[in-house]
A protein has these predicted regions:
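N-terminal secretory signal peptides that target proteins for export/translocation
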Residues: 1-5
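Bacterial N-terminal signal peptides
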Residues: 8-21
Length: 341
């Protein structure tokens, strides 16, 4: 299932697609977002990808955005309306949009759907995701070197495999730097709730965490780290504007290349459902610049591991297969908090 996942994003494919005739009219592309676009976070990064696609393709595409759409019936209604309005490509950018997207895709077989983080496909629905865990491991190495208490706090959305992968990879990296380190997890059961994200961050600080990270959609954790004087590994966006002294680095999502490639494939008539799980070497994720107070030897360690990942010489989860990683549902040693099951 996971073989040849990233071919749709290669330079060779982009060059090949450019040789095919384009639509006579702009391709109508819609993006459905689970939270407001805002200034940073999950949805903001997807919208940066949309804008990069527009910049790359110009008048070949015309985009529509619907933001702050709840998972469930609202998402289904919005996607159905977009399909009925003549959108030919719809990006459903939240995990809980999968079942609604599958239902709408069955009703509109001529419309192409791309779902972020899903695990089911259809004749006209593809899934895509990033190997966030690669950068999470590197961030854990950095956190393990930076923490004085040996405790990191992790504010997490829902206990789905993608989130569990990130928690485990972070813990593996942190414990490589400090074998006694702990990662304490608090679940939000929400992807975007700034008030609860802040509350969870404060609780983790009270429990001894002097480094925070998160898998949630607002800058609240970053702002709390800055306010309380603890360190931060930001997620989704570079949060230096919110945490100029707290941020060590950030795990940055980059969707522009993928969105551009998908739109080009639809325009060229070459689109097909071929699940994509891209990593750091594919440009889906990157580390933001390190803070000025990160020691040179720590940077050297993280960079050495990053190069090993890029070159395929190191895998954070060792011999686990892609299928095993994709189904991850339990914590590794060093993680504490309510279990994912």
């Amino acid at each position: 299932m996971f073989q040849n996942l990233i071919r749709g994003c290669t330079a060779a494919l982009l060059a090949a697609l450019a040789a095919f005739p384009l639509h006579a009219s702009p391709l109508k592309v819609a993006f459905v977002y689970v939270s407001p676009i805002g200034d940073a976070g999950w949805t903001h990064q997807h919208d940066l990808g949309r804008r990069a696609m527009e910049q790359a393709l110009g008048d070949q595409v015309k985009t529509t955005v619907v933001e702050a759409v709840a998972e469930g019936p609202d998402a289904e209604r919005v996607m159905r309306d977009l399909a009925a309005q003549g959108h030919e490509l719809i990006f459903a950018t939240s995990f809980g949009y999968l079942e609604p997207a599958l239902r709408v895709a069955a009703e509109f077989p001529a419309v192409k759907f791309e779902h972020a983080g899903g695990y089911k496909t259809a004749a006209n629905l593809n899934t895509y995701n990033a190997r966030y865990y690669e950068a999470r491991y590197l961030a854990g190495l950095l956190a393990g070197r930076a923490s004085r208490t040996g405790i990191a706090g992790y504010v997490a959305g829902f206990p789905v495999p993608e989130v569990i992968q990130g928690i485990n990879a972070f813990a593996i990296g942190m414990r490589e730097a400090n074998p006694k380190a702990q990662v304490k997890v608090l679940w939000l059961n929400s992807w975007f709730d700034p008030a609860r994200e802040r509350e969870a961050a404060l609780t983790l600080i009270h429990q001894g965490a002097d480094v925070l990270t998160n898998h949630s959609g607002s800058p609240a954790v970053a702002q709390t780290a800055e306010e309380k004087g603890v360190k931060l590994v930001a997620y989704q966006s570079d949060m230096r504007r919110f945490a100029p002294t707290a941020q060590l680095t950030a795990i940055v999502h980059q969707w522009g290349g993928y969105y551009t490639a998908v739109a080009r494939s639809v325009i060229a008539g070459r689109w097909k459902p071929q699940p994509v799980w891209g990593g750091m070497k594919d440009g889906f994720i990157a580390l933001a610049p390190f803070a000025g107070d990160v020691p040179k030897e720590t940077i050297a360690l993280v960079e050495a591991r990053r190069r090993a990942i890029l070159e395929g010489r190191f895998r954070p989860f060792g011999a686990l297969s892609d299928a095993q990683i994709a189904a991850m549902d339990s914590f590794v040693p060093g993680v504490s908090g309510p279990g994912p099951k």
